Amino acid sequence: FSPGSSQIVGSFEKGDTKNINVVRIASKNFTEQHILAEMMAQMIEKRTHLSVDRKFNLGGTIICHEALKRGEIDLYAEYTGTGLMAILKFPTMNNPDEVYQRVSEEYLNRFNLAWLEPFGFNNTYTLTVRKQDAVQNKWKVISDLIPVSSKLVAGFSGEFQERPDGYPGFQKIYK
């Protein structure tokens, strides 16, 4: 799986030149993104003279990326692994620093978009099961689920189901 550190990606050019004192912050359509976007909004409001137009729950990766390219938003939090694979269509890389460098360069060259410094945490996919089930069945690692996999029901985001480092990669490893 590709490392997925989170950082802000934003445009160099302000799309809405009517109001240069407003920063339009978007988020994807899940809780972690709402929290990150709100944190960015509050920091900007507290530390600058700028106002923030919150465009939270905008949609998935492609929707946010395209809105940023079109100048409809000014920034949103993105994950380097998502940028690498979902937007740039590059294969998995395992070194977080190399992923960040590659994504930063490609976004600048292809889209004139800048990646800022990482937020300082890594976000990777994992599986979660009820503790009671894990204890009762002695599940400690993912491979412990293989014998009962036909009886399990999993729920994944649409992006995880399609990304090579998501469900397809998971299936290759745990078939």
Model-derived features: where do they sit?
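Short, low-complexity disordered leader/linker segments with a strong preference
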Residues: 1-22
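Short, well-ordered beta-strand elements
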Residues: 18-32, 50-56, 150-155
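Short coil/turn segments
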Residues: 28-31, 131-135, 156-162
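Ligand-binding cleft/hinge of the Venus flytrap
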Residues: 40-48, 142-175
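Short helix-initiation/N-cap motifs at beta->coil->alpha
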Residues: 53-66, 158
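Alpha-to-beta junction loops
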Residues: 69-78, 149-152
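A ligand-binding cleft/hinge motif common to bilobed small-molecule-binding domains
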Residues: 77-92, 98-105
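A conserved helix-loop-strand patch within extracytoplasmic ligand-binding domains
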Residues: 99-154
